[in-house]
């Protein structure tokens, strides 16, 4: 009897965890139609908001220093995502190319666009400027920078046993022609140690690999 109860409880917990993971990810019902001709995507520098304590703000050079740190963090996430996609491409598990961030950022700079000004442009405008078919953008908010070693671990946040969140990473993909949101991944993060930006981004993306629409594993 106890074994039966345990088995039923385990089944419910697995189902709950799966449902929680699904809620974190949105895929446009018309994805295949909108993205069927996509060949190249570009990753924007991420918008980062660090909610640091007063002493940490002072340690990082005040508000101006924190702003510079946030900008660096945004570039780190951009680069980490690109590195992840390169590995997927090498494994023959990615159906599109991803523009080198160096080219992306150079074109943005030539157009006079700083990271803080990206939100003033539509996905269509950015795609035309960069010569790509889709735009990957997003945001990261946390009480700790990802790149300083006091990192954030990637524990799945589910139900009653959920750990205290210390941040959130949101990844969006928009179509470059219609501007429609094609895919969104909204991931809460929990406190941990020993991880850097690449490790965090890779772990997060692996959790969503089968639901990433440009992956050959995608069944949607």
Segments the model singles out, each with a brief description of its role:
Residues 1-5:
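Positively charged n-region of N-terminal signal peptides that target proteins for export
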Residues 21-52, 129, 140-151, 158-220:
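C-terminal/domain-edge helix-coil "capping" segments
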Residues 47-137, 176-187, 207, 211:
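N-terminal segment of the mature soluble domain
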């Amino acid at each position: 009897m106890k074994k039966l109860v345990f088995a039923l409880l385990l089944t419910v917990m697995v189902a709950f965890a799966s449902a929680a993971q699904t809620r974190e990810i949105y895929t446009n019902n018309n994805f295949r139609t909108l993205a069927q001709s996509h060949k190249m995507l570009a990753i924007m520098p991420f918008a980062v908001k660090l909610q640091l304590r007063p002493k940490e703000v002072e340690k990082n050079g005040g508000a101006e220093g924190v702003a510079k740190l946030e900008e660096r963090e945004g570039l780190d996430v951009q680069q980490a995502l690109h590195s992840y996609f390169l590995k997927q491409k090498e494994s023959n598990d990615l159906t599109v190319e991803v523009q080198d961030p160096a080219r992306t950022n150079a074109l943005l700079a030539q157009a006079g666009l700083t990271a803080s000004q990206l939100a003033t442009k539509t996905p269509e405008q950015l795609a035309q400027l960069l010569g790509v078919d889709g735009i990957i953008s997003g945001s990261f908010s946390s009480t700790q920078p990802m790149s300083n070693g006091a990192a954030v671990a990637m524990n799945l946040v589910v139900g009653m046993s959920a750990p205290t969140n210390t941040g959130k990473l949101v990844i969006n993909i928009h179509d470059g022609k219609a501007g429609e949101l094609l895919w969104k991944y909204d991931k809460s993060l929990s406190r941990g140690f020993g991880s850097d930006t690449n490790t965090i981004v890779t772990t997060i993306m692996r959790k969503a690999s089968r639901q990433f629409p440009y992956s050959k594993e995608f069944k949607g």
